[in-house]
Amino acid sequence: CITQGFITTFAGEPGTGKTSLCNILAKALGLVTDIPQRRFVDISVERGWSSHKDFIGYYNPLSKKMERSNGEVFDAFERMDSEYDCDQSRVAPFIILLDEANLSPIEHYWAAFLRNCDLASVSNRSIPLGGTQSFKLPEHLRFLATVNFDHTTEELSPRFLDRSWIIMLEPTRVDDEIDENIENAEDMVPFGAMKDAFCIREDDVIDEAIQNKWNTIQKIFRDRALQIMPRNLKMVKNYCAVGCRCMERDTPATKFAPLDYALSQKILPTINGNGENYRMLIEDLLKECTSQNMPISAKHLERMKRIAENNMGFYQFFSR
């Protein structure tokens, strides 16, 4: 998800380890070092944000100077701007975490980044700061986000869901709590190594059985007049192609693992509606995605079905 997507979102109830997982990931990549070498920045999102200038900074036309909203974040983007023209394969990734990201509408304060989510176009990716000032966005920049869902938070818009991977974390038992106290990796993992491992290659192919099941799932959506957006189709295709190369799939429960993960993290989060059409969609998907062959997707679909029965037939991935 992180290598192939510009932003990956961790969703779940408070205390499910969303922020801890982000920190563990950054440490595993060797990014949590002392400033100024540190390449992982944690931003605590605040209510009322409406622009990226609220957490980065902006050009003040009166003083003719840059005003910093957050010194650490501003310095990070300034550093990435200077790295824009360097060899992207040799530098380590730079990860920015938006913690409690939906305390404010993400599509508002992150709007400048939404148009930069297409990683196929690495030229002219930048964010404006006012006047003639801007920061260029290098290929190795990635965002993580954590979100909760209660009366204090905002819903995730279709525009955002079209661009982000969504990883739903379930509540853990006390003895399964995540240990965040791991050592930072001695060496930073180069971004080029991540691309070599997890980006699609020319010789990557999707297993025929997985492709056939994916075709069937697409038909289920078409039969219900529900569209899967072109960007999502491409993201699922690339994920499955790489997953067929990287994942072990030697048991019935893991045979369709690449598609199981891709469906649960990219397609199911877009389901949001009520009525007979959505009821039949969930029923048809459950027939195709069983607990024996696609357990992750099946679990989410069963949850959505169960909650909808007590919620006037309203089907939504994030309903709890």
Tell me the role of every PLM-derived stretch.
Residues C1-R320:
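C-terminal regulatory/interaction module of P-loop NTP-utilizing enzymes
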